[in-house]
Every structure is written in structure tokens, then in C-alpha cells.
């Protein structure tokens, strides 16, 4: 996202073992494809043994091709997607600033999931999220799903959707009493 730079862990620590996947960035979760980057040959052999012991790493035949195409040939598409997601984030921030004054949107660093502090409008975010489901027909996740202490007072909004759908959901939320 603008103002943030991705720093690969392998640059920070050459001995790091990096596990990643194109599934979120390139919407390829159905291919169940990921990769492991490990520079130490002995450790790599141990990893290979461990993941093959129960045959848990059967490769989908389309997965490696999709992974290579995603990482090598999709930079323009990813840049455009990130631009759209950033537009959704700014639309969220603008809407909140005008209509949901007790919400505070946290800075977005590198994801399509917005973290929103709603502690000023409710005492119990899980109850508030249930109210949003019942009255606004909008399903948001309470922050405590992602950490009982660190998530307290927050909810999470998925920005990977059409902007019209995001704005419609926000308008429905603004129309109910908190």
C-alpha cells in the first residue's frame, strides 16, 4: 500500500525459512499452492522429510504453473488491484469521517483487511457485530477473533469487494443505532 514497502524476511535474515503463497494476492486459494524458501540444504532435507511423511504435500498440477505465472507475469495486475483496494480504503476512511464518527480506521499497511477501533460506540464488539448482522445485514468480524487482548475494541472489514458493495454496507451500518 502507498507509503509502505515489503521487505522479504530472507533479506533480513539469510537463515530464515520463508513460507508463502500466492493465494491471497492472486486469488488462487483453490489451487492449494505455496512454497518454501530455505537456503540451508540440510534444513531443506529435514523439511522435505517432514512434509512428505504423511503425504501432505501432494501438488495440484496447476498450482506450480499458476504460482510461477502469478509471481513472474502479474505485476501490472497486482498493482492495479492494490490501487483499487487503496481506493476502497480511502472510501472507507471518508465514509467513516462523515457518518460513523465513533469509528476510527487504523492505517492500512499491506492487506485488504481494515482494522477499525469501535470502542467509542460499543462496550462489546461481538454484541455490536451481532447487531450489525441482525439490523444492517452486514457481517463483520470482531477483533477478538484474531487475539483476545489485542483485538479487543476492534472489528475487521474486508476491502476486497466492489466499492459499491462496501459503500452500501457502510450506509446500512450508519442507518442503525449503535
What are these regions (language model features)?
Residues 38, 42-62:
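Active-site C-terminal subdomain of aminotransferase-like
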Residues 41-42, 61-80, 95-100, 118-120:
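Amphipathic alpha-helix from the class-I
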Amino acid at each position: 500500500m502507498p507509503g509502505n514497502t515489503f521487505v522479504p524476511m530472507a533479506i533480513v535474515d539469510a537463515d530464515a525459512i520463508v513460507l508463502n503463497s500466492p493465494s491471497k494476492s492472486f486469488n488462487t486459494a483453490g489451487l492449494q499452492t505455496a512454497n518454501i524458501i530455505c537456503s540451508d540444504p540440510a534444513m531443506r532435507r529435514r523439511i522435505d522429510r517432514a512434509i512428505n511423511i504423511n503425504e501432505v504435500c501432494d501438488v495440484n498440477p496447476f498450482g506450480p504453473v499458476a504460482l510461477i505465472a502469478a509471481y513472474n507475469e502479474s505485476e501490472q495486475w497486482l498493482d492495479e488491484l492494490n490501487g483499487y483496494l487503496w481506493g476502497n480504503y480511502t472510501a472507507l476512511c471518508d465514509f467513516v469521517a462523515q457518518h460513523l464518527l465513533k469509528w476510527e480506521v487504523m492505517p492500512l499497511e499491506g492487506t485488504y483487511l481494515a482494522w477499525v477501533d469501535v470502542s467509542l460506540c460499543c462496550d462489546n464488539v461481538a454484541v455490536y457485530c451481532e447487531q450489525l448482522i441482525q439490523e444492517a445485514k452486514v457481517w463483520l468480524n470482531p477483533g477478538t477473533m484474531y487475539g483476545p487482548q489485542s483485538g479487543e475494541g476492534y472489528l475487521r472489514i474486508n476491502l476486497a469487494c466492489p466499492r459499491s458493495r462496501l459503500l452500501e454496507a457502510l450506509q446500512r451500518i450508519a442507518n442503525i443505532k449503535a
